Amino acid sequence: KALDYASKVKGKLTAAAALQTANIYSRESKWDDALKALDTIKEDQEPAIVEEAALFKARILLETKGEKTAFDALNASLISMPYSKALHYEAAMLAERLDDIKTAEFHLKKAIEIDPGFANAYNSLGYTLLEQTKRIKEAERYINQAYQLDPRNPYILDSKGWLAFKQKKYIKAIEYLNDALKLQKELDIYLHLAEVYWTQGNKRKAA
């Protein structure tokens, strides 16, 4: 019934109806049908819906075709939406998964340029530099900026803790990581905390 209704929608609501149609098909794992519905949404339609459709398409392609195809689709969408911080952010996440750190850094910096208050972008950039490069001072600057913007974000607290660990500030690292775990019981945070305890020689707590 929902599909019948969506197919009859005309005018300004056509793009929203197509997005809803794609959602319905995706819930049934009918990926090709979902992609066809998304492809009916044109660049000159409602910007928020066009952006959401581009992100949705990338998620489907990631599920069905892999990181490279999804990344290429996002890049294609960015040609018509170069000021979408969400598209730049998702492109960065995929670039990192493809081990293309330079491209990930580019997209995260573009997202920050578009929205200087984008805490998650600062955090992702800082954490990526911390893990993938030797630019620890630069990583620290981005992570601290993220923390100033959103000090109760568990993922940012995790980054603060991991940064402190890399700087051999183990007590501070434990504080940040425990604060993160109070907000979000996440495996990666537990693993970071365990590594801090192990490095300290506290194997009982590490276990």
Q: Which ranges hold each PLM region?
A:
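Structural signature of tandem alpha-helical TPR/SEL1-like repeats
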Residues: 4, 29-36, 64-73, 98-110, ...
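Alpha-helical solenoid scaffolds that mediate protein-protein interactions
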Residues: 6-9, 41, 77, 111, ...
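Structural marker of alpha-solenoid helical repeat scaffolds
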Residues: 9-12, 44-46, 80, 114, ...
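Residue-level recognition of tetratricopeptide repeat
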Residues: 14, 23, 48-50, 59, 84, 93, 118, 127-128, ...
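TPR alpha-solenoid repeat register
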Residues: 17, 53, 87, 121, ...
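C-terminal soluble interaction/assembly domains
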Residues: 172, 178, 182-195, 199-201
